[in-house]
Every structure is written in C-alpha cells, then in structure tokens.
Amino acid sequence: MRYLWIGGGAIVLVVAIAVAVGYALPVKHRASGESTFKATPDSIFTLITTVEAFPTWRSGVKAVEILPATDGRKRFREVSGHGSITFVVESTEPNKRLVTRIDDKSLPFGGTWTYDLSPTGAGRTTLRITEDGEVYNPIFRFVSRFVMGYDGTIKTYLADVGKRVG
C-alpha cells in the first residue's frame, strides 16, 4: 500500500510540474523548417494545395473533407487517428506562397502555417514552412514544447513531401 501512495504522489507531482511549466510558457510560438526538393515550384505548389489528395501522401491523414467556403476562401477538414482539424486557406500566391489557418475554436491550439516556395535552379525548389501557433491549454503547451517539439509536425510534413516528390 505504501508503494501505491508513493507512486500516486509521484504522478500527481509530475502532472503539477507539467502544469506549472505549461503556465510559464508563452501561449504563442513560432517554428519553422525547410527542405529543398528535386521538383519545380509548380509541382510542389500543386501538391500542397490539392488537399483532397493528402491521404495519399501525408502520414497520419486518413481523410480530407471539403467544407463550404467562408468569404470565398477554401475550407477543409483533415481527419487523422487523433481526431479532426478544420483549416481555411487565408491566401495564396500561385507557385510562391500558401497560408492556412486552423479554423476550429473548440481546439486547445490554433495558428497559421505559411508555406513559402523558392526556386533554387536546376528544377529544384526550397519549401519553407513557418508555424505561428498558439497553445491555450498549459498541459498542451508543455507537451507541444517538450514532448512533440514545436517543429515536429513541420518535420513530418517536409519528410512526407520528400517521399512524394522523390
């Protein structure tokens, strides 16, 4: 019984520390990453804007639902094993830039993703992704900072693009 109390106390202490650290972390963060691919800006832009095809190349995305547009802006919902997230396309500059925003106020996080494409010559393109994120829940702030890493999803996305375009 004594070990049960010690184990339970240790769990409570770890959770309390995670909450305290989470409260100390800022709500907003910025993370970015980039990779260069053997593909033209046009082919990369087509890949990242054809959201209906995400389940065929993005790891973790099981389905994409196209939703009614808001103020003429495309909206879609990504479905994964962890749930779903609704996005809205804030702006596009064909073959140069895409900006999406999480469009779901019920989530404990939000923010925008900016995809910048730069031709680097010889049919190669650098894709830079910048996340301007917000994590409202202190426990999620702790997890996103110390467990997943702010750039974890960006790294996965870039790796998925690389697998798709070669």
Where would I find each of the regions flagged by the language model?
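A short, structured loop/turn motif at beta-sheet edges
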Residues: K38-P41, A69-D71, E90-K96, D116-T126, ...
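A generic beta-sheet turn/junction motif
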Residues: F37-A39, S80-H82, E93, S106
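Hydrophobic ligand-binding cavity/cleft-lining segments
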Residues: R2-P68
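Short beta-edge strand/loop motif at the mouth of beta-sheet-based domains
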Residues: E52-T86, N95-R97
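Short, surface-exposed coil-to-beta transition loops
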Residues: R30-S32, G83-F87, F109-T114
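Hydrophobic pocket/interface hotspot
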Residues: S43-I48, F54, F76, V89, ...
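Beta-strand/loop substructures that line and gate deep hydrophobic ligand-binding cavities in soluble
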Residues: I102-T156, V161-K163
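Generic structural detector for well-ordered beta-strands
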Residues: E34-K38, E65, R77, V88, ...
